[in-house]
């Protein structure tokens, strides 16, 4: 049995989440409300929302938790070649927070293997949009010849980044954005990106599962640190992975 949360109710301890032998491992609570304030409380405790349209808001704290250390991003030979091409080619850009809501909508409309529909509902878009307006959620976008072709978004609290979703309309476009994000976060002392749930795709990028207790302890410490400011970078951060200087701007 999981807790039902009224607006004033705190989250139960994450240890109360359903266990690995249940039908929904990691499910902790449900609510009708999805406010920016509730989201911030959740993230600082290692909890995230994930639900489908027509369901109540479902809150999760999975054990183990999938995380990516920015320096551990796995850059394949082919991706490294792509990053070098991006650095040389003026048609490629990395833009930060250019159109956060458009990135969310692109993530929502991208088909996912094994998923019908999307969990990025209108309520999710509204709540994360409010966080973005307050400087707490960010998008990293890959642009090619003036068109957004890939990107990702997530929540940034202190020195912790909580990844939410990504999309690509061109080969490796989301990985380009992720490589830029990892380089930027690594430069600012961020040790861990939350990837939430274990998938083969995340593992192929260098993410690994860690015990929930270890994750929650790290989140508490990292979110108490000063926030990164400003969130401003371009594709030159990709030099970390490509080993090639970016071409000078025309």
UniProtKB/Swiss-Prot annotation:
Of the GO CC terms on this record, one is: cytoplasm
InterPro entries per UniProt: Acyl_CoA_acyltransferase, Leu/Phe-tRNA_Trfase, Leu/Phe-tRNA_Trfase_C, Leu/Phe-tRNA_Trfase_N
Q: Which GO terms describe its biological process?
A: protein catabolic process
Record flagged with keyword Transferase: yes
Q: Which GO terms describe its molecular function?
A: leucyl-tRNA--protein transferase activity
State the UniProt keywords alphabetically: Acyltransferase, Cytoplasm, Transferase
Is Transferase there in the keyword field?
yes
Spell out the subcellular localization from the entry.
Cytoplasm
Just give the chief location class. cytoplasm
Give its E.C. classification number: 2.3.2.6
The chemistry this enzyme catalyses reads: N-terminal L-lysyl-[protein] + L-leucyl-tRNA(Leu) = N-terminal L-leucyl-L-lysyl-[protein] + tRNA(Leu) + H(+); N-terminal L-arginyl-[protein] + L-leucyl-tRNA(Leu) = N-terminal L-leucyl-L-arginyl-[protein] + tRNA(Leu) + H(+); L-phenylalanyl-tRNA(Phe) + an N-terminal L-alpha-aminoacyl-[protein] = an N-terminal L-phenylalanyl-L-alpha-aminoacyl-[protein] + tRNA(Phe)
**What Pfam families does the record tag this protein with?**
Leu_Phe_trans
Please explain the role this protein plays, according to its UniProt record. Answer: Functions in the N-end rule pathway of protein degradation where it conjugates Leu, Phe and, less efficiently, Met from aminoacyl-tRNAs to the N-termini of proteins containing an N-terminal arginine or lysine.
Which NCBIfam families does UniProt cross-reference here? Answer: aat
Name the UniProt record assigns to this protein:
Leucyl/phenylalanyl-tRNA--protein transferase
